[in-house]
A protein has these predicted regions:
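N-terminal export/assembly segments and adjacent metallocofactor-ligating motifs
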Residues: 1-289, 299, 310, 319-323, ...
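N-terminal leader/propeptide and maturation segments of large enzyme subunits in energy/redox metabolism
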Residues: 120-126, 284, 288-318, 484-561, ...
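A short, gly/pro- and small-residue-rich
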Residues: 225-246, 356, 423-437, 474-476
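Flexible glycine/proline-rich, aromatic-decorated loop/lid segments
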Residues: 259, 445-480
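A glycine-rich, hydrophobic/aromatic-adjacent loop/helix-cap motif
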Residues: 330-404, 471, 558, 564-569
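Long, low-complexity segments enriched in small/aliphatic residues
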Residues: 352-355, 518-618
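Hydrophobic alpha/beta core scaffold segments
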Residues: 402-405, 415, 419-449, 453-462, ...
Length: 764
């Protein structure tokens, strides 16, 4: 055994521990270099030992665009909170946003440029210099551009907005390529299409939950994962508790109880894919009851003739009395609001469903008034780029082009379709046919592992950028993100990488900026110049400093709001196609309901240990994937909690343990999205299963979006058990009569005892 003398032992103890913390044991010889704690030779400008400094920036953990404020000490980020001045989140921040520090300090970050040395996908890489990596990419792109083959270059990015999106567009325009795609599994393309069809507007509306008195949600988990949950949570709370008049009433319609369903006054389970029929049945009743008397009333009556309450009740499984009661309450409460999304929008008739929800708002008079649906004005900065959001059809077409040799270079910016796109799109096979794949990701995700070159980007806490939230908050808003710490590793900002490539390709005139910060300043100078003389700052420098310091800016001289004009042909086109499912009901008796969680999102949170340890708010499960089954269904199949089942669709199969969950329809099973990574670091790899991988390529014909709620599955009991890690115990009484019952299920003595408790009920 190697010996160590007293003096060396004391040195090790002074370094932090008796050797163990340094990565080796005392029983072994010391082979690793000694690491010293070196103070700043040139400390940051605002460095003050022991004094915290706060920087305002923008959260990019999802697409909501919340403002954040980051506490730093001694040049290190310590805590992230919401920016109180930002109108989207107003000082609040979700758990995923709080975990942004673990993106910055994640031990699995890519720390330097790398080039592939082994077979593609083998994980064999070597470090290279930035000059070498950028030159390899620039030389290939320059050659393609000179030969007029620019359209063989594809830039595939996560969803980005603002001047970075504009920079991508300018770069690809110079390449002569129209293949700039933004792909995210969560992009609400169906909602955009429905609003474009019904209103002729391309922007998402503002849903005024704060001022509504009656909310009908058709599948939209507005408190959990839908569009901007922090902002919607604020509106929900104020409608419920901060009103001087009657508190808002909330009704949630969905096949599986979400966070929003648990917080609602009433949860209603409609047959999957029939939510739009329910909306039209309510609209039919409003017309029949005289709740709408507009000049186009007769046209609406004719259009909705087939959606009587009786026929809708038969289709949806919801009693006619319930439909009439909801319709009356919705029409008679002012203001009221109907929203749609989530699984209701994830069916083959998703666009029809959301158009029906818009029609319900129109007939109830909820358009353009506080507490209803308000369309946002145009963003303060609109990108004039070639970019477009890619859906399943677009990605399948890209894969087909790659297999046919029409894609020579693929550049990836934090997009991970290997995890978030069903295999039926053919994307994995397509990668084998692309000569050069370049990734700008900060992590080794599934798609980055297939790259030839990796040019790793800074995290959002190390970068300059900006954002213009979509949907807005009723007036134009812009946010600026700034570096809150110096870069930890040999990485570069995404915008700076693109600008350096442009310089090496001789595109200085088209993209003349030295770095992303300079591009931002020039872009925000245009915004400053548009402001009225009465509201603008004394100089641009004063304006820029104030925006960076505050982290947010709102346009004081708002533009005229878009008018609510319904296309004349829309009323005649109102119809609900029956939902189509992949797999016949005999062989595949259950409808798979994949859902987003507020921790994992589309899987991007899986490499953050805080998110892995955060209990699911509805089931209290952590760390894995599970299959939620109704108790009646579980009993009929002989299943209990922890039974390992095989979930099989027409596209594949996966295994997960059973979790008996009473808040789900008997013919529906639910699985959370986010786990099942084969790469993406130590915290995410080989944990749980990914239900996206067994989704069938069932599309919404109107848009090409994936109908991700339209896959049928069957369950096969493997006879094995798996331990579910839960923090919430069980939801069953085990015969102990813990939960007292009232109504027909209660005994007369128990009923009398419950009714003896003095309860005051607020008037409706």
């Amino acid at each position: 055994m190697a010996k160590i003398d007293r003096r060396d032992f004391i040195k090790l103890v002074g370094a932090g521990s008796a050797g163990a913390g340094a990565g080796f044991m005392l029983a072994q010889s010391i082979k690793h270099p000694i690491e010293y704690l070196i103070p700043y030779p040139v400390p940051p400008e605002d460095f003050s030992p022991g004094i915290a400094t706060w920087y305002n920036s923008v959260c990019t953990m999802c697409s909501a665009g919340c403002g954040i404020t980051v506490r730093t000490r001694e040049g290190r980020a310590k805590k992230i909170e919401g920016n109180p001045s930002h109108p989207v989140n107003q000082g609040r921040l979700c758990a995923l946003g709080q975990a942004g520090l673990q993106v910055l300090y994640n031990p699995d970050r890519l720390t330097a440029p790398m080039a592939r040395t082994g077979e593609r996908g083998s994980g064999s890489f070597e470090q290279i210099t930035w000059g070498d990596g950028l030159s390899r990419v620039a030389d290939r792109l320059g050659s393609i551009r000179e030969d007029g083959r620019g359209d063989s270059v594809c830039f595939l990015s996560e969803g980005v907005r603002g001047h970075l999106a504009d920079l991508f567009g300018r770069f690809m325009e110079q390449m002569g390529s129209g293949r700039l795609l933004h792909y995210e599994f969560t992009h609400p393309g169906t909602l955009y299409a429905a609003n474009q069809h019904f209103f002729g507007e391309q922007y998402l509306p503002y849903y005024d939950l704060q001022n509504t008195r009656f909310l009908l949600s058709f599948g939209a988990d507005y408190l959990g994962s839908w569009i901007s949950p922090v902002h919607h949570g604020l509106g929900y709370g104020r409608s419920r508790a901060a009103r001087h008049d009657t508190r808002g009433r909330f009704v949630q319609i969905e096949p599986r109880m979400s966070i929003s369903g648990a917080a609602a006054d009433e949860w209603i389970a409609a047959r999957p894919g029939t939510e739009g029929m329910l909306a039209l049945g309510m609209a039919h009743h409003i017309l029949a009851a005289g709740g709408y008397n507009g000049s186009d009333r007769e046209q609406w009556v004719a259009a909705l003739d087939a959606y009587s309450v009786g026929s809708v009740a038969a289709s949806t499984g919801i009693p006619g009395d319930t439909i009439r009661r909801l319709a009356d309450r919705f029409a008679q409460t002012n203001p009221s609001l109907a929203i749609g999304g989530g699984a209701a929008a994830g069916h083959s008739n998703g666009v029809d469903t959301l158009v029906a929800v818009n029609a319900l708002n129109y007939l109830a008079g909820n358009l353009g008034q506080a507490g209803g649906l308000l369309f946002n004005t145009a963003p303060a900065f609109e990108t004039t780029t070639l970019s477009r959001h890619a859906n399943f059809r677009t990605m399948a077409e890209l894969a087909a082009d790659a297999r046919n040799g029409r894609i020579e270079v693929l550049i990836l910016n934090h997009a991970n379709p290997m995890h978030t796109l069903p295999p039926s799109a053919g994307f994995r096979e397509a990668l084998d046919h692309i000569p050069m794949i370049v990734s700008l990701s900060s992590f080794m995700d599934e798609t980055t592992a297939m790259a030839d070159l990796i040019l790793p980007s800074h995290t959002y806490l190390e970068s300059w950028g900006d954002d213009f939230p979509e949907p807005g908050v009723g007036f134009p808003v812009g946010s600026v993100s700034q570096p809150v710490v110096s870069p930890l590793y040999n990485t570069r900002a995404t915008g700076d990488i693109i600008l350096e490539l442009a310089r090496k390709m001789g595109l200085d005139e088209a993209l003349p900026w030295a770095d992303m910060k300079q591009r931002l300043r020039e872009g925000w100078k245009d915004i400053y110049d548009r402001e009225s003389a009465a509201s603008k700052a004394s100089s641009f420098e004063a304006f820029w400093s104030s925006v960076v310091e505050a982290g947010v800016w709102g346009e004081k001289t708002g533009r005229a709001a878009a008018a609510f004009t319904v296309k004349p042909e829309v009323i005649d086109s109102i119809a609900m196609a029956a939902p189509e499912f992949a797999g016949d009901s005999d062989s595949y008796p259950f409808i798979l309901h994949p859902y987003l969680t507020n921790a994992m999102h589309d899987g991007r949170g899986a490499n953050l240990p805080w998110m892995q340890e955060l209990p699911d708010p509805m089931t209290s499960v952590v760390y894995g994937t599970w299959v939620e089954i109704n108790p009646v269904t579980a009993q009929s199949l002989g299943l209990s909690d922890g039974d390992l089942v095989q979930v099989e669709s027409t596209e594949g199969q996966l295994s997960a343990p059973v979790l008996i969950f009473p808040g789900i329809m008997p013919d529906v099973i639910a699985m959370p999205i986010g786990q099942g990574h084969s790469e993406y670091g130590r915290y995410a790899k080989n944990r749980g299963a990914n239900p996206i991988q067994i989704l069938a390529p069932q599309l919404q014909s109107a848009t090409g979006d994936l109908a991700w709620s339209a896959t049928r599955v069957r369950l096969v009991n493997t006879g094995l058990k798996a331990n579910l890690v839960k923090t919430g115990g069980v939801s069953r009484e085990l015969g102990r009569d813990i939960i007292q019952k009232t109504g027909t299920a209660a005994s007369s003595s128990q009923h009398a005892a419950l009714n003896s408790i003095p309860i005051k009920v607020a008037p409706s």
